Regions:
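Long, charged, helix-rich clamp/arm modules that form nucleic acid-engaging surfaces
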Residues: 1-42, 129, 165, 177-178, ...
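Conserved phosphate/anionic-ligand binding catalytic regions in large, soluble enzymes, centered on
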Residues: 20, 29, 74-101, 327-331
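Conserved glycine-bearing catalytic or ligand-binding loops at nucleotide- and phosphate-handling centers
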Residues: 40-43, 91-153, 183
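A short, contiguous, amphipathic alpha-helix enriched in charged residues
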Residues: 40-67, 174-199
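A short, flexible low-complexity segment enriched in Lys/Arg and Gly/Pro that occurs
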Residues: 55-75, 109, 137, 304-305
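Short, hydrophobic/aliphatic alpha-helical segments
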Residues: 65-85, 312-317
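Short beta-strand elements
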Residues: 77-80, 153-163
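Extended active-site and interfacial segments that coordinate phosphate-rich ligands
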Residues: 94-114, 174, 178-181, 186-196, ...
């Protein structure tokens, strides 16, 4: 008996980075070998169970040794809430994540009224919802992204200026922009201090724990904490931008999508999935009803049916005679 062992990986992109391709290959192989998805999301389990109900089309994988779904029959707008990032020949996509509750509210509103404009949908989805937090600095980039599918969203770290018992000020960082690595951020601040490009910093310490992030920058007594902070915003990733480029495949072709487009195509996808699932379940129910009707006919004429089977030379002859005698048909 051969066994495959899978190494557990704890991945936190804020702390450090691993090769995403390795992780994806590992999870894909684990799924193919065990049929157990590496997720606790209930929607994932329901999604996988619906694959067997002809809800989506299948295609051959890269070496044509098995079939894989073209898309998943998901019940959640994953592209909108999770975002996406990728590069292809001559194009790239970079989609921001959004809040699930806001996205659901916007989708429900759109289903109720297909004539809603982007401005109406923006009453439900206010802005991207980055998992690492931060503060969106300015709204024009968000508005551009929602209206055109392309925009530059500026995100600042969430900071507080505290004063200790000795009267010394501290810059406390509680949240950092999306896709910024905490370790690299601290290294960049240290480098600026060593190169004397930023003055007034006495010490920097990472006090983060399971309760949350806390990077503490001690300010010298003769320095102004606001001046230091503004320099850090300008010279480090404490302030960074997320360039939105909403390119996604629509019917196999790349398209630039605004907010309404993203919601529209998700609703259309769900509509198709529900119809195909219902058609599959109806066909299965009709097959079952057909069998039960046949069983009822045979049970009502059980002795004669048994005699026909005994008198037949082989199963094929028995099947033919039963069908002719009782008006049965194949599925």
């Amino acid at each position: 008996m051969s066994e495959t062992y899978y190494e557990a990986i704890n991945w936190n992109e804020i702390e450090d980075i691993i090769d995403k391709s390795t992780w994806e290959k590992l999870t894909e192989q684990f799924w193919l070998d065990t049929r157990i998805p590496l997720s606790n999301d209930l929607d994932d389990w329901r999604t996988l169970s619906q694959l067997e109900k002809d809800t989506v089309d299948f295609k051959s994988n890269y070496d044509e040794n098995r079939k894989e779904p073209v898309v998943f029959p998901t019940r959640t707008p994953n592209l909108l809430i999770n975002g996406s990032s990728g590069i292809a020949v001559g194009m790239a996509t970079n989609m921001a994540p959004h809040n699930l509750s806001e996205a659901v509210d916007a989708i429900v509103a759109y289903i109720d009224n297909r004539d809603l404009e982007i401005a109406d949908l923006m009453k439900y989805i206010k802005a991207p919802d980055f998992p690492t937090g931060g503060i969106i600095y300015g709204y024009s980039g968000v508005k551009d992204a929602f209206e055109t599918g392309r925009g530059r969203v500026v995100v600042r770290s969430k900071v507080e200026i505290e004063t200790d018992a000795q009267g010394r000020e501290k810059i406390v960082i509680n949240e950092i922009p999306y896709m910024v690595n905490k370790v690299e951020l601290i290294k960049s601040v240290v480098a600026l201090v060593e190169e004397k490009k930023v003055e007034g910093i006495a010490h920097i310490n990472d006090e983060s724990d399971r309760e949350g992030m806390r990077i503490v920058i001690d300010i010298k007594r003769d320095a102004n904490s606001n001046v230091v902070l503004n320099k850090l915003f300008k010279m480090t990733a404490l302030q960074s931008s997320f360039s939105v480029n909403n390119i996604a495949l629509v019917n196999g072709r790349p398209r630039m999508l605004n907010l309404k487009d993203l919601i529209h195509y998700f609703v259309e996808h769900r509509h198709e999935v529900v119809i195909r699932r219902t058609q599959f379940e109806l066909a299965e129910a009709e097959k079952r009803a057909h069998l039960l009707e046949g069983f009822m006919i045979i049970l009502d004429n059980l002795d004669e049916a048994i005699q026909i089977i005994r008198d037949s030379k082989n199963p094929e002859e028995a099947r033919t005679r039963l069908m002719e005698r009782f008006g049965l048909s194949e599925i």
